[in-house]
Amino acid sequence: MHTIIELDNQTTLNVDIEALEKIAQSLTNREIELIITDNENIQELNREYRDRDNPTDVLSFPLETPFTEQSVFDIPLGTIVISADFVRERAKTYGHTEQDELKLLFIHGLLHLLGYDHETDEGEMRQKEREIIEEFGLPSSLIIRND
């Protein structure tokens, strides 16, 4: 299996990188940087890049490139930043594992890197999330939350 996720885990959260790789490879063959951080650091990024001064669950930073055929040039897709604090809190709240919550946030971030935007696409991104959640046998509590 070709590794496409470059992991920078700045926390103690356990990360099932093989499971995330399978999800990523079902959607792209381009490299993805995945940063797992805490609420303090993600709040700083949220403030700097989105003008929102609060922590959030996941941020995506697509790599802008002038090429039309990006995959030909092996250019990375971008960076996904996930808050381990949110992963732990939401897993507890919704009654599923931290790994399942991490997978959901990874899927959400990856779809943003691929150009989906739930704020403007009339449900297209949510539908794609649902399909991936079902394809990988993730708990229905992840789907319900996204409706």
UniProtKB/Swiss-Prot annotation:
Chief place where the protein resides: cytoplasm
Keywords: Cytoplasm, Endonuclease, Hydrolase, Metal-binding, Nuclease, Ribosome biogenesis, rRNA processing, Zinc
UniProt-listed HAMAP family: Endoribonucl_YbeY
EC number(s) on file: 3.1.-.-
Pfam families: YbeY
Top class in the EC scheme: hydrolase
Binding site for Zn(2+): 108, 112, 118
Descriptive protein name: Endoribonuclease YbeY
Family indicated by similarity: Belongs to the endoribonuclease YbeY family.
Keyword Protease: no
Organism (species): Sulfurovum sp. (strain NBC37-1)
Lineage: superkingdom: Bacteria
Gene name linked to the record: ybeY
